[in-house]
A protein has these predicted regions:
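Membrane-interface segments at transmembrane-helix boundaries
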Residues: 1-8, 49-62, 89-125, 166-186, ...
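Long hydrophobic alpha-helical segments typical of transmembrane helices together
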Residues: 187-242
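Membrane-embedded alpha-helical bundles that form the substrate/pore pathway
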Residues: 31, 72, 203-207
Length: 242
């Protein structure tokens, strides 16, 4: 069966979907609260900085409605971009506590792979720390490019894609692969990068990134068993359970 449809069937089952309820609720709350206060705070700062009473070229330029509209639109786009992906990251982080259970259920249901020694918590935290260390300079570079239209969006897009891809892959592979197999994965296969890019684009839409996090995880779990361990799902077990 196609991995997409197999993942979609699992995604719609309550035994899996229940794990996404808490992460979706917290991520949505963060998006609404932080998004509102971030936009209004930055707008208030810009209005105060470019207030008409102050003298200077930038204050004069900001007094034009067209210029004010462009700056506030950029503010909305960048803040919206940041809040959407940050809320998705928080949702993904919460869901990561349930990913080992999700992977174990999928393995028991379809693949019957005998798990060996898993990654330890310390080793997993070290891998996450390495990802964050590489993400920080990318994020600061994006901040430097903040006031360059369109370039700022591309910079933030690439920086957060790096974090999204690596965090999602780490979350899934650490739950699926044993310690030895994990260390052998020096490079992520192109097929994984392609799908995480598609997931990242979907996550750029408000709410979609929150609701579909569980699907992303389930899909990559199936992909890992089939493309790394080269296992085929036992569909007879699947058919008998439906």
């Amino acid at each position: 069966m196609n991995i997409f449809w197999l993942s979609f069937k699992d995604y719609t089952r309550f035994e899996f979907f229940k794990y996404a309820l808490l992460s979706t609720l917290i991520g949505f709350s963060f998006m609404m609260i932080v998004g509102y206060y971030s936009f209004t705070s930055i707008k208030a700062f810009l209005d105060a900085f470019f207030m008409p009473e102050s003298e200077g070229f930038f204050a004069w330029l900001y007094s034009f409605a067209f210029v004010s509209f462009i700056i506030n639109s950029l503010n909305f786009l960048v803040v919206g971009f940041f809040v959407i992906f940050t809320s998705s990251a928080i949702s993904l982080f919460i869901l990561s506590f349930f990913t080992p259970k999700i992977a174990a259920k999928i393995n028991a249901k379809y693949y019957h792979h005998e798990p060996k020694e898993k990654m330890g918590d310390v080793a997993l935290l070290l891998e996450l720390f390495k990802i964050l260390l590489k993400f920080i300079p990318l994020f600061f570079l994006a901040l430097i490019l903040f006031f360059i239209p369109f370039v700022n969006l591309i910079a933030f897009f690439l920086a957060f894609y790096y974090l999204f891809h690596n965090a999602l892959i780490l979350e899934v592979l650490s739950a699926v692969l044993d310690k030895k197999k994990f260390k052998e994965q020096k490079f992520t296969p192109f097929e994984f990068k392609f799908h995480t890019l598609i997931f990242y684009l979907l996550a750029s839409f408000p709410l979609a990134g929150l609701v579909l996090q569980l699907f992303f995880v389930i899909f990559l779990i199936h992909l890992s068993y089939q493309k790394i361990y080269f296992l085929s799902p036992k569909l007879d077990n699947f058919s008998s359970s439906t």
